[in-house]
Every structure is written in C-alpha cells, then in structure tokens.
Amino acid sequence: MADVAVLAELRGIDEERLKPCADWVAAHADTHLPIVAEMDGHVVGAAWLLGVQRVPSNESLDRWYGDIQSAQVRSEYRNRGIVGALMAAILIEARTRGLLHVTVHSGRRAVDFYLCNGFSHHRQILLLEAAASPRPA
C-alpha cells in the first residue's frame, strides 16, 4: 500500500492529523483500497475504491458494490491522462472483485469525465444530504 503520509498529503490532511489518518487507513484496509499513480518514483495521484457488502438476496448471498472516492492528481501533473489511468485501474479492480455496480459522487467539473468513462445518471439512486435532513427527536 502507498505510504499513508503521501496519501494524506494528497488529500490535504494536516501533519498533526497524520496519526489518526494512518489509524483510519489501517482500520479500513478491508473496505477501502487506494490506487496510486506514480511518475519517476513519486506518487502523483490516487483514488480510492470502497467495497461495500449488500444485504443477501435469493440470487446471491455475496453481493458487493463499489464507490469511487477522492480521485485526485497533483496540479502540476494534471491533463496527462493520469486520472484516466487511475479510473481504468479502479474499474479493472471492480470487475476482478465482481462488484455489482460502482458509484461515484462527483464534483461538477468531473461529471463529463465520468460519463466518458462509462458512468451514467441513474434514476433510482437518490441522495439525502445529511446536513439538510431533520434529525430525529
């Protein structure tokens, strides 16, 4: 696995939060896989594939889906196809793991990128923003 300090730095995590970040990465190693892009021996980008097990059904007791999280490339390495290579690696991993589907919560600027990589808008995936929802009394 890539050095946690490098992954944290890519995410903009402050140095004083490095230990809790490393603890989080270790605690989530079974569900969160970082895929890294390197150039000249340096990590220049990363993206995470979250694997989540779904409730069993009659068709399968082993149902998993994926979610792409935190795809980032250092600004000086952008527009070189790196994020495309990260996406290709993530989608290969998703197929290897037999994930039913892969979702992504994208920023506006990246929507077209994901659409060009096979993603589509889906009418059955709904989102409730936790901050906007009322909390139970």
Locate predicted features:
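Conserved acetyl-CoA-binding loop-helix of GNAT-fold acetyltransferases
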Residues: 73, 79-92, 116
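Short coil/loop residues immediately preceding or within conserved phosphate-binding loops
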Residues: 32, 63, 68, 121-123
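Conserved beta-strand in the GNAT
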Residues: 36, 42-51, 67, 72
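A short beta-loop-alpha structural element at the N-terminal edge
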Residues: 1-9
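A conserved beta-turn-beta hairpin within the catalytic core of GNAT-like acetyltransferases
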Residues: 53-68, 78
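Active-site rim helix/loop that mediates acceptor-substrate recognition in acyltransferases
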Residues: 14-38, 48, 54-55
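Conserved active-site alpha-helix within GNAT-family acetyltransferase domains
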Residues: 84, 96, 100-101, 107-130
